[in-house]
Amino acid sequence: MSVDGVLNVLKPPGMTSHDVVDFIRKIYGIKKVGHTGTLDPDAAGVLPVCMGRATKFTSYLMEHDKRYRFEITFGFSTDTLDKSGKIVESGPVPLFTLEKLQEVLSQFKGEIQQIPPIYSAKKVKGKKLYEYARKGEEVEIPPIKVTVYELELIKYDAPHHLLLDVKCSKGTYVRALVRDICKKLEVPGHMSFLIRTEVGDFDIESSYTLEEIKEGKAEVQPVDKFIKFPSVELDEVSSNKILNGQFIRNTYNVENSLVKLYDNHGIFIGIGVAEGEKIRPKRLF
């Protein structure tokens, strides 16, 4: 069975992102399957999965911004920063004013620095951070730069629960955001709920449950639909040159940019690099 495209999967809580990939492999009977960005096992939500030749372009889909709905529960913090971990601190919970909450949240908008959670797959010195954590080894975690485009207070269920919505750049750790918000509020807390509602143009409304996928109700989308580069349609001669690994003359009014390349029938053939007067192939479909 030849399946080349992207599936917008609604990952349920309790499964790893790799579990979802294995599920898709079995359902479609194909080996080449890869997701476009890990979602924590306890989290649910949008997980775009590339299949077949579309897996060549997974890295381009990983660049997309993401949106999450999440809940902070005040009263205790954990080593994993979510509800699955061991309690490391507990304390009384004050009643916050909405003004105080908004004032603190405003400090996390724009470009910020985060320390990734120790229980994460982020690599430091060649090892994943959770490997250090499981062995009880100390490691210095360098901060990363991320961008928070939107951070909205959805509901304050006083005094213990805060529901928020965030739109952020790739690589943002929501658990770390929760940790840092709690630190600013001077109250122990953890992330008690997380759902990813958007990854670029993939949204939760158009995602498919595993049951729908199993029943054959899911629609596989063409991967180029979700790659955000300028499009260039080539004539037959130029298409053949690109497919044979050769460069072509850049007469398409695109400069110093990655471009989506289409043949003279409008069929996607890959990604090219426009450099000055030339366009060369970078990754072919």
From Swiss-Prot:
SUPFAM superfamilies: Pseudouridine synthase (SSF55120), PUA domain-like (SSF88697). It catalyses: uridine(55) in tRNA = pseudouridine(55) in tRNA. Keywords: Isomerase, tRNA processing. Its EC number is 5.4.99.25. The keyword Cytoplasm does not apply. Transmembrane segments: none annotated. It comes from the Bacteria. The active site is at 40 (nucleophile). It is an enzyme of class 5 (isomerase). Signal peptide: none annotated. GO terms for molecular function: RNA binding; tRNA pseudouridine(55) synthase activity. Belongs to the pseudouridine synthase TruB family. Type 1 subfamily. NCBIfam families: TruB (TIGR00431). Responsible for synthesis of pseudouridine from uracil-55 in the psi GC loop of transfer RNAs. HAMAP family: TruB_bact. This is tRNA pseudouridine synthase B. It comes from Caldanaerobacter subterraneus subsp. tengcongensis (strain DSM 15242 / JCM 11007 / NBRC 100824 / MB4).
